[in-house]
Swiss-Prot record:
Transmembrane segments: none annotated. It comes from Crocosphaera subtropica (strain ATCC 51142 / BH68) (Cyanothece sp. (strain ATCC 51142)). Belongs to the universal ribosomal protein uL29 family. InterPro entries: Ribosomal_protein_uL29 (IPR050063), Ribosomal_uL29 (IPR001854), Ribosomal_uL29_sf (IPR036049). Keywords: Ribonucleoprotein, Ribosomal protein. One of its GO terms (cellular component) is cytosolic large ribosomal subunit. This is Large ribosomal subunit protein uL29. HAMAP family: Ribosomal_uL29. GO terms for biological process: translation. The keyword Nucleotidyltransferase does not apply. It holds the Pfam family Ribosomal_L29.
Length: 78
């Protein structure tokens, strides 16, 4: 599995982004569980999944800040 591109994440809608975050959190949980029970064969999947989670959370935070910046800018203009 190749590391995902940030451009792919930016194209997601807000709802898709939220769903993807939940799915990735679940995947991390499953990977941790597999590791604890010594069933995990591909340990590099942790890196890929954590990288994906970081991308998703970064895009989510950028969108929150853009919303706040645009609303505060319009409030300052008034």
């Amino acid at each position: 599995m190749a590391l995902p591109k940030i451009e792919e994440v930016r194209q997601l809608s807000d709802e898709e982004l939220a769903e993807e975050i939940i799915a990735t959190k679940r995947e991390l949980f499953d990977l941790r569980f597999q590791q604890a029970t010594r069933q995990l064969e591909n340990t590099h999947e942790f890196k890929h999944t954590r990288h994906r989670m970081a991308q998703l959370l970064t895009i989510e935070r950028e969108r929150q800040l853009n919303i706040n910046q645009s609303s505060s800018t319009s409030a300052e203009e008034a």
